[in-house]
Amino acid sequence: MQQAPEAMTLKVIAHIHTAFPTKFGIPRQSGLVEELRGEIIFTSEYRNPDALRGLEDFSHIWLVWQFSGAVRENWSPTVRPPRLGGNTRVGVFATRSPFRPNPLGLSSVKLEAIEQRPDVGPVLIVRGADLMDGTPIYDIKPYIPYADCHPDAAEGFTGQTRTHHLEVFCPEALWQTVPEADRAALQGVLASDPRPSYQHDPQRVYGMEFAGLEVHFTVDGAQLTVRDITLL
């Protein structure tokens, strides 16, 4: 049997375009904010519609992608998950941290549509992605419920730190500055508490970029208050 090489070259097959130009505010996992819309545009080499034949019959897909916004040359065998307060160390392979030997991410997203565009070929319209704008995609696979869903799976430390939801208050005048098509997604992102898990100062004003807007907010207890929204 031929021995497999110790290293391989991955080819970027596509890039995803989302509402997040920076890492701050991106949901901690895919599917938490299904209103988030993304577009996957293939590189010129992989714009052959035949490669997507049959994919329209699946409701969800897996994306294999690169943590392009958090690349490090070195990796650590242990990391400190933000969901544990940033103080407890856990083995890197027991987390989804980007600081791993191969900085690859895996996300399950809803496949809403496949569009054919004359300038870029087939485009996948997805919902619920937890990726930064421009993230390179290395592979796409169909989500297969009977094989991929494990209702009785143990969830480790994540079961102790489930994502909580905040009540979002935004003055109507500010809310009207948000395009109607983006409001539900922004509401979902804010409700899922985009702050780092270890920051709880009610006086601190946080800022995040979303869909061409800069949103400033504070969080006091279980309520998030939008303080300002400006056009970038």
Predicted regions and their residues:
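Mixed-charge, low-complexity intrinsically disordered regions
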Residues: M1-L104, Q116-I125, A129-L232
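Conserved positions in beta-strands of structured domains
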Residues: H17, V109-E112
